[in-house]
């Protein structure tokens, strides 16, 4: 199972093509739209979310509500395109139009300058349009398909924010996916402890007034994953490595950890490893889950716990200094539409990206031409594990 995305932030539409989804998976546009709506929510979101109300159109790979094994094409129309039609036109246009919305002042923290240098662009909008977080719309759409597949295999996933701009969010250690959905899933801040919500909203409002932005840390948990996904035999087959790569590929994400993560480096081994236990009804389990569900690059049957660090959004209404690429004179960086924070939305992106990697791994490991075949293969594998 693999996918590609295409489209620019202010272009006519965004597109994703997914190949390798088993035939026979029940799938509707509404399944995907639910996730797209979640991505557009959250406290601190601004202008673009008022313009766009994302709705997916499925144009291939699904017939009469079921996947048919061929590539699935997903399209999301950019409603704001009507205001950018000439500026973003595929055909050549007059020079005066080309100069409209031309970007020559790269924004610190964005791809603008390095992208312009790499591809020899005189207009940095060519970089901005594709490097924009708008692309994550389609990663969420792809993730929605993956989550539907995982649900059929009794694998569930959820996320919540555990640190908001340096402020720790209180939550118990042994959180289930259901716990997260019933708390953070109903919060516009995506936090477990709603008693901290009002203080955080005031904090975000202060940041916005100051023309600044904040980041934070998001935790995603996956339940129902059988032991043995991934492999220790080659570096590129380790599933935690694949998840880590996918998470840091999300716009503005700068770090990732599993279980205790970086805290593990501060403790002796006796306080880090999870002791192995066995029982007649559950088979092999662990006494704790400080390694976040991974050993040797493979799932160990415990809950997968992964955290991603999101830097503050680099587009500031109180812009930092930059250099104009035409004149080489110092200027305050260009300002595009921005939000004080996008942590709750980024959590939705991370959740769907992790779901996609897990679904890919399952489809790679097991026979998966059809959903029936995949269900049988997974059930047979779980039975074998239980007898070990």
From Swiss-Prot:
Recorded catalytic activity of this chain's protein: 5-O-(1-carboxyvinyl)-3-phosphoshikimate = chorismate + phosphate
Residues noted as binding FMN in the record, renumbered to the chain: 130-132, 251-252, 296, 311-315, 337
Binding site for NADP(+): 39, 45
InterPro entries linked to this entry: Chorismate_synth, Chorismate_synth_AroC_sf, Chorismate_synthase_CS
Cofactor(s) this protein requires: FMNH2
Pathway: Metabolic intermediate biosynthesis; chorismate biosynthesis; chorismate from D-erythrose 4-phosphate and phosphoenolpyruvate: step 7/7
Origin superkingdom: Bacteria
GO molecular function, one term: chorismate synthase activity
Membership in a protein family: Belongs to the chorismate synthase family.
Its job: This reaction introduces a second double bond into the aromatic ring system.
Assembly description: Homotetramer.
This protein's name: Chorismate synthase
Native species: Lactococcus lactis subsp. lactis (strain IL1403) (Streptococcus lactis)
Lineage: Bacteria, Bacillati, Bacillota, Bacilli, Lactobacillales
């Amino acid at each position: 199972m693999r996918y590609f995305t295409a489209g620019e932030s202010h272009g006519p539409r965004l597109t994703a093509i997914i190949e390798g989804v088993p035939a026979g998976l029940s799938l509707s546009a509404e399944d995907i739209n639910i996730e797209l709506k979640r991505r557009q929510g959250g406290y601190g979101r601004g202008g673009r979310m008022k313009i766009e109300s994302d709705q997916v159109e499925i144009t291939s790979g699904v017939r009469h509500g079921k996947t048919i094994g061929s590539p699935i094409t997903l399209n999301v129309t950019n409603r704001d395109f009507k205001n950018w039609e000439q500026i973003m036109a595929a055909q050549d246009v007059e020079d005066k139009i080309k100069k409209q919305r031309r970007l020559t002042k790269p924004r610190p923290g964005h791809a603008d300058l390095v992208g312009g240098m790499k591809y020899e662009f005189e207009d940095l909008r060519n970089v901005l349009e594709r490097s924009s977080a708008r692309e994550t719309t389609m990663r969420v759409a792809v993730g929605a398909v993956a989550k539907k597949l995982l649900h059929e295999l009794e694998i569930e996933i959820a996320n919540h924010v555990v640190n908001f701009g340096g402020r720790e969010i209180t939550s118990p250690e042994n959180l289930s996916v259901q716990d997260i959905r019933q708390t953070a899933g109903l919060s516009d801040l995506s936090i477990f402890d709603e008693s901290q919500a009002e203080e955080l909203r005031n904090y975000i409002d202060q940041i916005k007034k100051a023309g600044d932005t904040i980041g934070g840390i998001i935790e995603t948990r996956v339940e129902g994953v059988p032991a043995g996904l991934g492999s220790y035999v080659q570096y590129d087959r380790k599933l935690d490595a694949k998840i880590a790569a996918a998470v840091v590929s999300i716009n503005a994400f700068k770090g990732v950890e599993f279980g205790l993560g970086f805290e593990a480096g501060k403790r002796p081994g006796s306080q880090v490893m999870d002791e192995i236990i066995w029982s007649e009804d559950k088979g092999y389990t662990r006494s704790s889950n400080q390694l976040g569900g991974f050993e040797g690059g493979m799932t160990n049957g415990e809950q997968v716990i992964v955290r991603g660090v999101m830097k503050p959004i680099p587009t500031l209404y109180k812009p930092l200094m930059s250099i104009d690429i035409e004149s080489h004179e110092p200027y305050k960086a260009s300002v595009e539409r921005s939000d004080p924070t996008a942590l709750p939305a980024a959590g939705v992106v991370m959740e769907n990206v992790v779901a996609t990697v897990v679904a890919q791994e399952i489809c790679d490991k097991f026979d998966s031409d059809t959903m029936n075949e995949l269900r049988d293969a997974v059930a047979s594998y779980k039975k074998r594990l239980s007898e070990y």
